[in-house]
Structure formats: C-alpha cells, structure tokens
Amino acid sequence: SLRRRFVKEIDRAGYSQLNTMGLVGCQGAYEVGGPWLDELKEYIQGNIQYTLDYFKEHLPKLHMYRPEGTYLMWFDCSELPLTPEEREQWLLNDAKLWLDSGSMFGKDGEKFERINVACPRATLTEGLEALRRAYVAKGF
C-alpha cells in the first residue's frame, strides 16, 4: 500500500526518529514561546500595513489585498499591459524579484502575484523598492 511504502521510506531515510534538539525546541516554544509569537505576529502585521501603504503610494496600477490570516499577500496586475509570462520575465529580469505567479494557482490567478512579507523590514523594503524602480522604468 502507499502508506506502507511511505513509512518504509521514512524509516530508511532516518526521519522516523525524533531529533532531541527539535523536541526540546518544540517543548520550549509551547511552554514559553507565547510572547515571542505575539511579537512576531505584531511585526508581520506591521509589514502588511507597510506593504499596503507602499503599493498605494508608489505602485498605483498594482492593487494589493490585505491577507486574511497569512503573511502571503496578493496583488492584482490586471492594469499592466503584460501577459503572465511577460510579467514574470519583467519581475525576474528588471525587478530581480522571484514572486509566486498567480497562474500557478489556476486560470483565476493569472493576473495576480503573491509576495511573502514575513521577513525583516529591510528585506521587504529592498524588494518593494526594486519593484518600484522596475515599475517606473517600464513607464507604468
């Protein structure tokens, strides 16, 4: 059966055994990690608001959506005169950004890109500024 083959492969690879450090880390996270998690969630919410504000001010043809329970944000590129393939090449070659193309989620996602904002603010700012420079250079 598929399950038996899966378990056999897990055992063969050594993943069936608990890692002592991982176990201690997990226990610590559950016992004393609450304040850290609260701070992390607050930080990510700050990044979300920062991204929403940045798009509104600097990238008016790209419409950013507030996420509902995640740190992955979607933005609508339907006002750009680019196919999904052209947009991906523009993002990679001009902005030097590798985002998640919405087309990987099906036809309804073709006009969207997805960005991860669970990172240091400096990293996020660097990426957003690269996107803005490519946006301006393209004349959008």
Model-inferred region functions:
Residues S1-F140:
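PLP-dependent class I/II
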